[in-house]
Amino acid sequence: MEKMNITNQEHDAFVKAHPNGDLLQLTKWAETKRLTGWYSKRVAVGEDGEIKGVGQLLFKKIPKLPFTLCYVSRGFVTDYSDKAALEQLLEETKKVAKAEKAYAIKIDPDVEVDKGIDALKNLNALGFKHKGFKEGLSKDYIQPRMTMITPIDKSDEEIFQSFERRNRSKVRLSLKRGTKVERSNREGLKNFAELMKITGERDGFLTRDLSYFQNIYDSLHEDGDAELFLVKLEPKPVLDDIDNELKELESEKTQLQNKYERKQVKKTKNKLNDVEAKIQKSIERKDDMTDLLAKHPNGIYLSGALLMFAGSKSYYLYGASSNDYRDFLPNHHMQYEMMKFAREHGAKTYDFGGTDNNPDKDSEHYGLWAFKRVWGTYLSEKIGEFDYVLNQPLYQLIEQVKPRLTKAKIKISRKLKGK
């Protein structure tokens, strides 16, 4: 096993093809981290000209100190049962990390617990310190240890039937409401950033500005690894649908009235009352859409998301939504359409991102888990974070300070949420 010098293209091709590959190990992802103070290096190892493992190393300077942290996000990408490859990856990483004055090397492989026995054993033998099996969204981790994933290598109907029953009803309703899911372009990021700002204000979290999302899009879209989706409500088509709906309801009402006049049966009267209630709701919706048409004849955007790719894996990233017309369930329409798009573009899985495992109802993470669990998902529990310490005194000092910083961040977050 030896060091290999490979191109960015060869690195990315290996990551996309490997079962332990991940979006965060793509070279273009490293470009998106520059705005937040990270820079990157790469290592690769192999034998007989064949790549056996790679690592994209992110470095960030420790404030007021001449040291850095080396972070291999969702790496290394290798077969963790291959001791020789793993050991060589560590050796090459140590050389680079020491040159960059890193006090530690942190990794968090995309390896699930039920497949991670070899990884745990071999990483421990190499001197890595395991950070434990804590909750998926523990503040002690950089990346979530648990995510929710929907298998999408199946037909539209099979994907739909994998959703929980109540969620299927919501998706059906969202499809009938008349919203339009658009695969947008760079210009659409302005609408997306505005939706994200609204979402942050509503849910109490700090949001990124437009330049951050432009950076992600510019870095990854050209290779087909980033797409922007927006959901638009256009009033004119919805008004046309409501008019057709009212015609059908009025016809049904007339038939029921005639039937009730001939024979006054309570069941017929109940049906008549139901139809009249539906007519009233449709009239109210028509008034609402007429008002929207006057104010926004071209429609308004209700939600959006970035859909990312790494080979056969797709990722739902940075979802945002408006406070208006939430009863139209735009996110449900968007999720189903993005899953189908991802499958059509080679993805076998659709990752909803981080979660805890069945949190209590009073947990701040319960709503997130409850939303993600109804989409035919399974819990992907990773083996977690590992640290390889290069500077023991500094590592211990930073580990002691980190809990205080975490508490401060939680306090700020709760203030934003008004708790």
Curated annotation (Swiss-Prot):
Q: Which GO terms describe its molecular function?
A: aminoacyltransferase activity
Q: Tell me which domain of life the UniProt entry assigns to the organism this sequence originates from.
A: Bacteria
Which terms in the GO cellular component ontology are assigned? Answer: cytoplasm
Is Cytoplasm given among the entry's keywords? yes
Give the reactions, separated by semicolons, that this protein catalyses. Answer: beta-D-GlcNAc-(1->4)-Mur2Ac(oyl-L-Ala-D-isoglutaminyl-L-Lys-D-Ala-D-Ala)-di-trans,octa-cis-undecaprenyl diphosphate + glycyl-tRNA(Gly) = beta-D-GlcNAc-(1->4)-Mur2Ac(oyl-L-Ala-D-isoglutaminyl-L-Lys-(N(6)-Gly)-D-Ala-D-Ala)-di-trans,octa-cis-undecaprenyl diphosphate + tRNA(Gly) + H(+)
- Keyword Cytoplasm in the entry? The reply is yes
Enumerate the Gene Ontology biological process terms.
cell wall organization; peptidoglycan biosynthetic process; regulation of cell shape
What span is annotated as the signal peptide, if there is one?
none
Q: What is its main location?
A: cytoplasm
What keywords were assigned to this record?
Acyltransferase, Cell shape, Cell wall biogenesis/degradation, Cytoplasm, Peptidoglycan synthesis, Transferase
Q: Which family does it belong to?
A: Belongs to the FemABX family.
Q: What does this protein do?
A: Catalyzes the incorporation of amino acid(s) into the interchain peptide bridge of peptidoglycan, using aminoacyl-tRNA as amino acid donor.
Q: What is this protein called?
A: Lipid II:glycine glycyltransferase
Annotated organism of origin: Staphylococcus haemolyticus (strain JCSC1435)
